[in-house]
Amino acid sequence: MSEQNQVVTPSDAPTDAELQRARKRLDALWRRGTEFLGTQYAILGGAMSWVSERNLVSAISNAGGFGVIACGAMEPARLAEEIQATRALTDRPFGVNLITMHPQLNELVQVCLDAGVGHIVLAGGIPPGAAIKAIKEGGAKVIAFSPALVLAKRLVKMGVDALVIEGAEAGGHVGPVSLTVLAQEILPHIQSVPVFVAGGLGRGDALVSYLEQGASGGQLGTRFAAAEESIAHEKFKKAFVRAAARDAVTSVQLDERFPVIPVRALGNEGGRQFVSHQADVIRRFQAGELTREAAQLEIEHFWAGALRRAVIDGDVEQGSVMAGQSVGMVTSVQPVAQIIEDLVEQATVALVRQQRRMDADG
C-alpha cells in the first residue's frame, strides 16, 4: 500500500484473522454489485470525456474494478474502434457510457450490442424507452443515473437493471443534492435493482458506510483521472495533486434568465473570465444589442472545447479542469491497481475497526 494512503499504525495493525473476517464481510456487502458487474470489486470507473478511454478503462477492469468507456460525442465508427481497442487490452468486463441526447444514440447502442458489451450506461437525461428496450433485447444490462427517488422509481418501472445515484460532490455536470442526502432518500426504497453511489468518494472507508446503507458498490471518477494510466496531460494531473477539496467549485450563474448548467471543476482563470463574460453578455442584452436567444448562445459557447484543452493540451488555466471534491484526496499520481488496492484495504480496515468497537461494547 502506498505511503500517502496508509490507514493504520503498527500499534493497531489488524491481525490476519481480523483482515480475513473483514474481507468476507466486505465481499458480502458488495456481492450484489460484483455479481451484477462480473468483477472482483464493485468499483466502477466514472465515465469522463477525453479521459475514460481504452488505457484507463482496461486498467480499471484489469485491477478488478469495472471500467467504463466515455462515448461522449464519438461517432458510431469511432466508438466501435475504441471498444475493440479496449478488448485488446483486457479480457475482463467493462461498460460503455452513452449520452442520451446524442443524435445517433440508436446506432451507438447497436455498436455496443454488436461488440458484445454487457453493460451500457445511459447518462445525460431520462433515457428513451426505446433505447432501454433495444439494450435489454440485445442481451445487455442497462445502468441509468437518478438524481431523485421519484425518478429512480420511474426508471425501475422502465426496465433499467441498475441505478447510479450521484451527489453534487462529483466532478463535471452535477445536480444540486449531496450524496449523503440522496443515499438516505433513495437507498431504503429502491431494493429491486442494484444501486451504486457516486460523488465525493475518495476512500474505501467512505464506501463501506454506503454499502452498509444498502448500496451495491461505488463509482469513482476523480480518483482515477490522475492515475498513471490516464492519458490526461501531466499538467492536468499535477493540478489534481495540488488541489484541495474546496478548489473544486461549481460554475457561477449571474442571471436566472440565462441558465448555466452546473459543472464542478477546479477554479482557474477561465472560470473567472466566464463570470466576466456573462456580465458583458447580460449588459449587451439589456442594451438591446443581443436577443435573449443570442445571449444564451454566447454564454453557452464560452466553454466550447474547454475540457479537451485541459485534459489533452494541458491548459489548466483556460481549460475546464473538471474534478470532484474528492480531488483533495488525490495526493500523487498512482497506478490504477494501487488506487484500487488502497480503496479495498481502507474498506477492510474500516470493517476491522468497526468489529473491534462492537467487540469492546459486547
Where would I find each of the regions flagged by the language model?
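Residue-level detector of alpha-helix initiation sites
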Residues: V51, L201-G202
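Active-site entrance/lid segments in N-terminal catalytic domains of soluble metabolic enzymes
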Residues: S2-P194
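Conserved active-site-proximal phosphate/metal-binding subdomains
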Residues: S2-A13, S178-F196, G202-G362
